[in-house]
Amino acid sequence: MNSEGLAVIETNSTRMEFSDVQHGSIVSLVDKRTGHEFLRTVKTATALWEATLVMTEGKKELSASDARRFRVETTKIGKRGTRLTMTWSDFAKPFQGVSVVTTVEYECPDSQVKFRLLRFEPGTEVGVWHVDFPIVGGIGEIGKNEEGDELEIPLLQGLLVHRPLTTIVKNEKVNHTSYGTYPGLLTMQCFSYFNENVAGLYLASHDGLGCRKDFVFDSDREGNGRFRVRNYPENMGFKGRNYSSSYPFVITAFQGGWAEATEIYRGWATRQAWCRKGRLSQRSDLSNWFRNTSLWVWNRGNADRVSPGPIELKKKTGVNVALDWYWWHHNPYDVFVPEYLPPREGALTFAKAVEKLHAMGTKVVVYINGRIWDMNSGSWDEQRASKAAALDENLKPYEEKYNIFMPENVIAPMCPTTQLWRDKISHLVSALMEDFHLDGVYIDQVAIATAELCHNPEHGHPVGGGHYWVHGYNDLIRTARDGARKANPDACLLSESCIEQFIDSFDGFLTLDSSWERTGANLDLSWDKMGLQGQTWEPIPVFNAVYHDYAITFGSYTSMTGVPPYDDLWPESGRPREFGKFATYNDKYPDQFAFELARTLSWGIQPMVTNVYPEMLGREEFDADMKFLEEVAKFHSVAREYLTLGKWLKPPEVDCPCVAVKMYIRSIYTAPDRISEMVRNSPAVLTSTWTTHEGSVCVVLVNFTRDPVNAKLAMDLNEYGFEPDDRITVSDYPRSGVQTALPSHKLEKTVNLPGRSIVAYEFSAK
């Protein structure tokens, strides 16, 4: 503790000060490289931790500032590290038995600063419900008037929020809060708040087990930014049970933007258990046909509507095509799950349709949901499903509703640790694979939905918090995958969204982020409230930046038609009046389809198109979209070494015009009178960069507009893994056979891209 009553942690990049007077609150956080102070001076500093505790009379709040005794001890770690140990005790009744110990440390001057909740002792008559730790308040703007300030959130593939203090902290429409759950919609544990021209702050938990936690960016008492992590102990609320988090939290300053922050996270993440099978190029357990697919068709309905689209696209493109088939099942979509069998057209008709698709060279994957059971279904009572349901703190099943056309149906998430649910899904997968000779099963929701806090004491797992949800589903998936492989040794299991915890269990992940604007109306994630027209957010490929060479992603929601399908098993009264009428929105939104498809390719995602039905085939108004789809699929097919197996690199600077892409927002449950639109400003040319582990680098430029574009490409190849004395050659890609030696490692090149075209260059060292 220095003369000013401050305990200091100082690395080469970061200086933090903790106030003795304010019970260990972080009162200064400085990027040492630039001298930027991230925290504003406040009247009352934010407590380093807050807790909700349980007593006989109910729940009460407690924080570090309530302690009447606080002490800090500074010790050395090894030769060059430092650890601060902070202890809070002597709380007023009824918390007189509470004692809390945390540490803040670094191992050497070049390392990150790690926070640990070492021990939370509640005393004999108190239980710990949850603990918010660490908490950093007083966060201010980085750039002047927030110009250039960004917040990266690992929501699905990734979300970039512009001017986050204005967009979130000062925004009453979102209750001054951005909140997410991991595992769940938050697919990783790394956040970054940065201004590329000034400094950045990396905020993450490094938890290899997958414990349930919530990340919150909100407002402190004085209207500044605040970042906190809510941690849920095993056996929540049990009196006398001490709590220690099994994972550290990392807060450190860095230089750059979200790409540089992902490199920090990748250094930890790719050493975790979910990457233990190695990079994609090293893995022998993945489905080969899935690895080599370059075009997906997502269709819904009976065979005569579903099959012609993928068959026609297979003929047109010649690439490996796969069908993701929805609404093949007995039950109406999103209700009466998991009563999928028999197929709604009958087993024989369905089997013949699969056989025909195979004969035409198309792989077939069918949809099921791997997480929920409809409490209105007959099987709920017959199979005593309530015993396997995840229960809330009142020992009632969590309740959800999805189908707006059948709102009386209530859905319950199931607990993956229960044998009933494991058997239900694994037996269903085996039956589908054995009876219908499928190529795989897409298991919805498992990788996207919240890891519920299950309070059922009969399930055998810790009550409430912990990592049992992830481990339960990993066991379930592996069992189901083993069963599928008995019927088809090259079968794949896929799931919705992308999440690190299931990388080594699922073969791949369906991600729709390249069509995020289109699907926004179907998800209650508040981005419409964040000023959709104001360009306050945009999707970014954070997950693929970290894991592209470890996990395969596929998908988009892009469609050439403006009318979503309507399940024939839903009530006729809810059918939109335009259903069954052919409609295209290409005249009003001429660039949306190509923009979403270009994003998909640029992010290294296997391309997908949705809702390709017989009435669309051969129509002149779709010729341009079909031609671009064909070009994208063919390019992906020849570039799989980069676009499926390669490591993502930060794209170089490309100077090109910016265009306004007019987009409509409509998902499957969007009524005709609820359709909305927005404008997304984007460079006319989307750029991505990839490397193989042999060291070659490929730069891909995609012009999604209808007009030719001249783009100026500038690269310093020393920033892409090449050594200063390397002799570098460049060639067109796919390889033309002509290699040109570069006179310098700094490349400046004007690239002429025709409308809706792809140009790529490959760089190699001699």
Where are these regions (language model features)?
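Short, acidic/polar
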Residues: 302-315, 421-434, 593
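C-terminal beta-strand-rich structural cap/linker in extracellular carbohydrate-active enzymes
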Residues: 742-766
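Active-site-adjacent "subsite" loops/lids of carbohydrate-active enzymes
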Residues: 355, 366-436, 520-536, 540
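Conserved structural scaffold segments of CAZyme catalytic domains across common CAZy folds
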Residues: 78, 88-96, 112-114, 119-141, ...
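Active-site-proximal substrate-binding groove within the catalytic cores of carbohydrate-active enzymes
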Residues: 23, 29, 230, 240-249, ...
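Aromatic- and acidic-residue-enriched carbohydrate-binding clefts of CAZyme catalytic domains
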Residues: 327-349, 379-416, 449-474, 480
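Active-site neighborhood of glycoside hydrolase catalytic domains
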Residues: 413-504, 517-520
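Acidic-aromatic substrate-binding/catalytic surfaces of carbohydrate-active enzymes
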Residues: 4-94, 103
